């Protein structure tokens, strides 16, 4: 098994919800017969964690912990000479003839198209094959969506990357031949800080164009404490990025 895939499986099961919560619940059940008090404590802790992580109050707070990025405006473009849109995921959609971009990728493409129209900058889409054997690449799916739904054509396709670090290094290789060292980077808010760090490492200065900027948590309202699957998914994404940021700091 590929070590990168194995690492992702371990992280998903042991560190990220809902996998980590399921593991904790199973552990609580297993030990409750021999150590009832400890087992109940684990079960209650996992249940409370599941509720909290399923609220927008917690998912929004976690997202804000990943960085501090304002909405993009054309005046912020500075020395940028290109727009880089990062892939996220893909879906099997028979109504679209097979593979197509997933919801997160589509959100990034939508903002990337808006930035392109506001600035006139050319677009690079970055994303390899989601799984071995997939065809086409995510970059090719993004190109198709930009053409069909936004009437835009990316100038460059980076089709080999498998993670954010490779998004950065391989995009930099392409843009270096065009003497471009500053880009507008389009990705989700909670993914932005780590992405910008990796792009800087690769030699590209990035101007942030974040998608899905967290809402304000004050004043407190019912919608922020009502559990929802979407909030749990957002908590998972934010925790994934916080772990990634911590790993980057440990590397240096």
PLM regions and their residue ranges:
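Hydrophobic membrane-insertion alpha-helices, especially the h-region
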Residues: 41-56
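Hydrophobic alpha-helical segments of integral membrane proteins
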Residues: 2-10, 58, 62-66, 239-246
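Alpha-helical transmembrane anchor segments
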Residues: 19-21, 205, 232
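Structured C-terminal subdomain patch of bacterial secreted/periplasmic proteins
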Residues: 227-252
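Membrane-interface helix-boundary motifs at transmembrane edges
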Residues: 31-40
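Membrane-embedded alpha-helical segments of integral membrane proteins
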Residues: 1-31
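A structural signal for short, hydrophobic/glycine-enriched beta-strand patches
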Residues: 55-228
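Alpha-helical transmembrane segments of polytopic integral membrane proteins
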Residues: 23-24, 55, 59, 252
């Amino acid at each position: 098994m590929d070590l990168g895939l194995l690492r992702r499986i371990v992280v998903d099961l042991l560190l990220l919800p809902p996998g980590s919560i399921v593991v904790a619940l199973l552990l609580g059940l297993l030990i409750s017969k021999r150590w009832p008090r400890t087992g109940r404590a684990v079960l209650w802790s996992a249940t409370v964690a599941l509720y909290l992580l399923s609220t927008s109050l917690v998912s929004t707070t976690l997202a804000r912990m990943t960085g501090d990025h304002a909405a993009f405006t054309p005046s912020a473009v500075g020395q940028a000479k290109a727009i880089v849109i990062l892939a996220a995921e893909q879906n099997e959609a028979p109504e679209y003839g097979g593979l197509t971009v997933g919801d997160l990728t589509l959100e990034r493409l939508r903002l990337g198209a808006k930035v392109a129209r506001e600035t006139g900058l050319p677009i690079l889409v970055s994303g390899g094959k989601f799984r071995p054997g997939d065809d086409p690449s995510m970059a090719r799916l993004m190109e198709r969506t930009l053409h069909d739904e936004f009437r835009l054509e990316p100038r460059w396709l980076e089709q080999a990357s498998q993670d954010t670090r490779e998004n950065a290094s391989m995009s930099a290789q392409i843009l270096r031949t065009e003497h471009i060292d500053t880009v507008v980077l389009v990705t989700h808010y909670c993914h932005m800080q780590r992405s910008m760090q990796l792009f800087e490492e690769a030699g590209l200065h990035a101007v942030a164009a974040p998608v899905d900027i967290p809402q304000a948590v004050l004043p407190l309202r019912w919608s922020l404490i009502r559990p929802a699957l979407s909030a749990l998914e957002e908590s998972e994404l934010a925790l994934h990025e916080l772990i990634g940021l911590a790993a980057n700091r440990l590397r240096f």
